[in-house]
Regions:
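Conserved Rossmann-fold cofactor-binding substructure of NAD(P)-dependent oxidoreductases
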Residues: 80-102
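Non-catalytic terminal and boundary segments that flank Rossmann-like NAD(P)-dependent oxidoreductase
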Residues: 1-39
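N-terminal Rossmann NAD(P)H-binding glycine-rich loop of SDR-like oxidoreductase domains
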Residues: 36-61
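Substrate-positioning beta->alpha
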Residues: 121-124, 174, 192, 221-231, ...
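NAD(P)-cofactor binding segment of oxidoreductase domains
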Residues: 112-140, 171-173, 177
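Glycine/proline-rich active-site loop of Rossmann-fold NAD(P)-dependent oxidoreductases
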Residues: 150-152, 201-208, 233-242
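N-terminal Rossmann-fold cofactor-binding loop
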Residues: 68-73, 88-89
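Conserved beta-loop-beta element that borders a ligand/cofactor-binding pocket
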Residues: 179-200
Length: 248
């Protein structure tokens, strides 16, 4: 019983830490403003589940896409308007080279080093922002997750008391740092916080806002619909400088 209570205390404490560490959006009236959709887009994390969807859907929208990847063979997408650059987000030189000439950057950065402390997400994001500033790229759309900042506890009991504290504490702490770094920057940014991801087909619809998710059950969304939402933010100011939840 004592160990169980200590574990519950640990999980609750971690949720509070994530709440304070991540960005806390101030809900403001939606401007509804739109702008010309960027045609030259850099996608970081392009070989992940969401990243591949971003590449495919951006190409469908007519964008000229640059994908920064560590292993080009993992992307498995061929297209005349796709430029694949081999590099590492932790290497500023490769990030800077990939950012040159872009109009916007989309980050679906992730990794699978879950079980020890890492700053891959936050350090990589610093390099992205530095390169954007160097080349005058103004718009960043970044994927993090529900369960961070003012969405802490909104991934349901299963994530709050098992998945995050047992499997992903370091990952979520670094996502929190990533959000804070973005929020402190001068770029035009939107953070997308999806619920639990799956590989279902795109439904073309989603719920999004500052109060998405709940404390009891886990909300879900496909990677395809997350990619669709993120691409829509390139030409919309509705959630400018906000961290917004997105789910079905």
């Amino acid at each position: 019983m004592t160990l169980f209570l200590l574990y519950i205390l640990y999980a609750l404490t971690l949720s509070i830490v994530l709440s304070r560490a991540g960005h806390r959006s101030r809900a403001v009236p939606a401007s509804g403003a739109t702008r010309r959709h960027p045609t030259r887009v850099l996608i970081v994390g392009a070989t992940g589940g969401t990243g591949r969807q971003l590449v495919a859907q951006a190409l469908e929208r007519g964008c000229v896409v640059t994908a920064l990847v560590r292993n080009p063979l993992k992307l498995q997408i061929k297209h005349p308007q796709l430029n694949v650059i081999q590099g590492d987000v932790l290497d500023y030189a490769s990030v800077e080279a990939a950012t040159r000439g872009q109009e916007a950057v989309i980050s679906a950065l992730g990794h699978k080093r879950f079980f020890y402390p890492t700053r891959i997400l936050s350090a990589g994001t610093r390099n992205i922002l530095r390169a954007m500033q160097a080349h005058g790229v103004s718009r960043l759309v970044c994927e993090t997750s529900l369960g961070i900042g003012d969405s802490a506890g909104r991934l349901g009991l299963y994530f709050t008391f098992f998945v995050i504290p047992v499997l992903l504490p370091f990952y979520f702490l670094d996502k929190s740092r990533q959000e804070r770094i973005i929020a402190a920057s001068d770029v035009e940014w939107v953070i997308a916080r999806p619920g639990m991801l799956n590989n279902n087909k795109k439904q073309g619809r989603s719920r999004h806002g500052w109060k998405i998710g709940n404390a009891l059950w886990t909300v879900r969304i496909s990677r395809a619909d997350v990619a669709d939402f993120m691409l829509n933010q390139l030409a919309s100011d509705r959630y400018l400088r906000s961290a917004v939840g997105v789910c079905w």
